[in-house]
Design a protein with these regions (language model features):
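Catalytic cores of Mg2+-dependent Asp-rich isoprenoid enzymes
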Residues: 1-175, 181-308
Length: 308
């Protein structure tokens, strides 16, 4: 299955095929459901390029998130320099950057989004929490959206459709809100509080309530409200599907549906989110993927598979 996608994408060089395959393994561990969606739902020529962009985003995110701040800052500075040099010269010996450059040669808009992402990625490095909802919105614009556009630009090839960036922002707003609630246990363990202080105050919840996993009416109401915001925003993101080519729509629908299923699982879990994250049941995931796989097959039977 994977080798046919490399062939369809015109990736024949043995070193480059090995690089793409290594990044595939990284993405499969990082986001297994989304990885399956890439393989099952996207046109074969596009799948390796989505893997390359996702792997770059994840590698950068790991450098920003893990370890003491001085080490993270030094690692990101070195990484940014290496990536910018590769963008300037068109060559690299790094197994994450080589596939990115190859994908950028096929999808030139990606390289502009890589530069935009690098311009503001240190926002995550400098993260100290949000005082207000406005602070969260700035984080969304400076980090979450540029990161998502690394992959979203591949789903709408050619000139960017009118309204596409705004539609992507709506989706990533809902997705980020969900992640911040669903990852509370992990983030709190890393002394990282992602809920705005004014939101905590309005619900009468303290950071200690969350760190100590207190199951109180106030905490339950807070979690319900946060997940309601995520659910509402994800529901508003569905129009983005109409802005990508028909061959890519099953993947986009599945992406939103997987997030909505995770939101439902998190809602059912309630205050237990303070000790571990929620995941949709396997039958739910399979139902989403199989439904959109049928849709993808119908599209491919009615259109020539030329995306990529």
């Amino acid at each position: 299955m994977w080798t046919t996608r490399l062939d369809a994408a015109g990736i024949h060089d043995p070193q480059l095929r090995d690089d793409f395959t290594r990044q595939r393994s990284l993405v499969a561990r990082y986001k297994p459901a989304a990885y399956l969606a890439v393989l099952l739902l996207l046109p074969r020529p596009l799948a390796p390029h989505m893997i390359a962009a996702t792997a770059f985003m994840h590698h950068t995110d790991n450098l920003l998130d893990h370890g003491p701040l001085p080490e993270r800052a030094a690692a990101y500075t070195a990484w940014e320099k290496e990536v910018r040099q590769a963008l300037a010269t068109g060559v690299s010996d790094h197994p994450v950057i080589r596939p990115l450059l190859h994908t950028g040669a096929r999808h030139p808009r990606l390289l502009g989004h890589v530069r935009e992402f690098l311009d503001t990625a240190a926002t995550d490095l400098e993260f100290k929490g949000f005082a207000t909802e406005s602070d969260y919105q700035r984080y969304l614009d400076h980090y979450s959206l540029p990161a998502f556009l690394l992959v979203a630009c591949l789903l709408a090839p050619g000139d960017e459709p009118a309204g596409y960036r705004a539609a992507c922002r709506t989706y990533i707003d809902g997705s980020q809100r969900l992640d911040f609630v669903n990852d509370l246990a992990e983030d709190l363990a890393d002394d990282r509080l992602t809920i705005p202080q004014d939101t905590l105050l309005s619900h009468g919840v303290t950071p200690a309530d969350l760190r100590l996993s207190r199951d109180t009416p106030e905490v339950r109401a807070l979690l319900r409200d946060l997940l309601h915001r995520a659910r509402t925003t994800l529901a508003a993101s569905h129009p983005v599907t109409d802005l990508v080519p028909p061959a890519n729509r099953p993947f986009v629908r599945a992406l939103i549906a997987l997030e909505e299923a995770t939101t439902a699982a998190a809602t059912a879990k309630g205050p237990r989110l303070l000790t571990s994250s929620a995941r949709p049941a396997l039958p739910t995931l399979l139902k989403i993927l199989l439904r959109e796989h049928r849709n993808a097959r119908r599209v491919r039977h009615s259109h020539t598979d030329t995306a990529g």
